[in-house]
Structures are given as C-alpha cells and as structure tokens.
Amino acid sequence: MVQKEKKFMRVKEMDDNSWRRVTGGYIGGSSHTSLLLNHNIRNKIIMECVGRLRSVDHDCIVVCGTSGLMVGPQVSEILQKNLVIVRKEHDNSYSDFCIEGAYSPRFVILDDLICSGKTIDYILRVIHNEYYRVECVGAYFYLQDQCAYQNCPEKFVTKYNINYL
C-alpha cells in the first residue's frame, strides 16, 4: 500500500491576516489556535471571559485541549478559582490521569467550541463518572465567531446541565 505524503501548509501560502503578524515573525497554524497565539487577541479573550464569568456562582473552571490551556489558567488565576484539566480521549500523555486539578462541586466549562461540540459532552461525561456531586453551572464559548455550531445561541449558556443516567 502506497502512503500519500502529508502536505503541510506553508506560512507563505496562508491568508495575509494582519493579526498573524507579530513582532519578529508570523503566527502559523490553524486559524483558532493562531488567534490564541497572538498575545493581544488572547489577552482580550481572557478579559472577556473574566468579565462574563465574574458574576457566575462557580468554584472552578474546566478546560480541555491546547486552546483551553492557553486561556483557562489565566482566567482561573484572575478569578481566584480552581482549574481542572480534562485530557482529551486517546491523548498520548505522560499522565495516567484523565482529570487533573482541584475537585470543586460547581464548575464552568471554558471551550473554543471549534470542532463538533463533542468536547462539552465528553467533559461532562468524564467529570460525572469521576465525581458524584458536581454541577455544571454553564459553559462559556470564547471563540464564538469561529464556532462549529453556526446556530450557537449565545456565548454563555446558563444551567448547561446534562443528566447522565
């Protein structure tokens, strides 16, 4: 069987987006990751998250994946909330733990909602399987304009509770 050579996009082939240009270089990568790698845009996203989540009654912030780890730690630090990281399914990692961080009963999910939206279902399933008395009080989608769900109602969905029997 002949394997096709994987073609990688070259930086010069990318759209000429001004936000990709930074001091000393050009941010390469997928559009949503590149947005978060631009520190000016990432800081605006972080402050928007903080502003929206400050009044929400929760104990911790849950993230999953690389983009979540670019935003979640700063948001949780500013809000003085615990941070919980849920590893993606089949993640080849040095850790044997699927969930890492300080357990808290009321949590908010921070997610980019880029692909299929299955991350939210996965996070809820994993946390509810691990901990019995937890409540997801909401999910905040910080890249709504990049959202895979074009019919996404609003960025913060209060009482985003799913019961798993």
Language-model segments: which ranges?
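PRPP-associated nucleotide enzymes
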Residues: 1-165
